[in-house]
């Protein structure tokens, strides 16, 4: 062939399966991230980047249980040889800390400086929606009842069926590709192409009418001087997730925000989550304000009512008997009363001492001692119950 007729291109054959290795590794990594999120959910829900995000779509959170693989030096100074005895099996531990049980110096924690390397952790971008799906899966408003006057019905659309015809906007690409691959494989050529009419799969929906009952949640928080930065952060973390849970799962739930010290007042959501106050503590003031709201706006005949009060338990001692009386009065009008006490050091609580004598099954309390307890408090207050669910 003359030089003029020489082609100006080359044809090469390449193993394209190698090009998918990166995608496969990425998928495995994402699966590990999701598993780590699921296993560390109690610690993740109180991460400051989430609570202070104002509900942004994506946030960065540290996942300390997920290692980022890399070659590490052995910091033990002893000499080693690399030959085994031939008895090793898959899964055997081949390297251990050579300290022999001796106390090792470590990274600095608290007071004092350490001389060892710090612990690396993986920082992942996670959507709030992913956390909500994992967190809210088993939560519901307890004792939710259908009110006599209220006949609201919620129209809900569920994509729960696959058909061979439908709108092109609803085509299920994954199922279509799988169907084409199976058909081509049966003909001796495992490939995603060509795609025939018989391979097409479309998602279709059904309109579901669900009975709905109105509800109101009274979010009450102690903002007195005894509530320190950590106590207020814990209380606001709980109410942050509570409001997102209610607005995600229920379409007709009102939320009233009440802050108190010696006096109680209804505040906006922004003020509730950002404004700091001081002063003494008279918890009965917030219960009086809650009863006033119920009498003026939220009749028990039309609303399911859920008061939630968070405090550090440091109340004026002479006010405790009045608090118990008002809580019992509230429970006559409410479906459930929840009290959360932020008590990190297990100190004596005048308010909890009084509340422990309340025997009503609709009174629930939870003592929060560490950040993970926000997750457990949500599970305790909003646990799923047997019987008819109304959402």
UniProtKB/Swiss-Prot annotation:
Disulfide bonds: none annotated. Residues 1-16 have a biased composition (Polar residues). Transmembrane segments: none annotated. Residues 1-31, 80-117 are annotated as: Disordered. Residues 98-115 have a biased composition (Gly residues). Residues 21-31 have a biased composition (Basic and acidic residues). InterPro entries: Spore_YhbH, UPF0229. Belongs to the UPF0229 family. This is UPF0229 protein BcerKBAB4_0466.
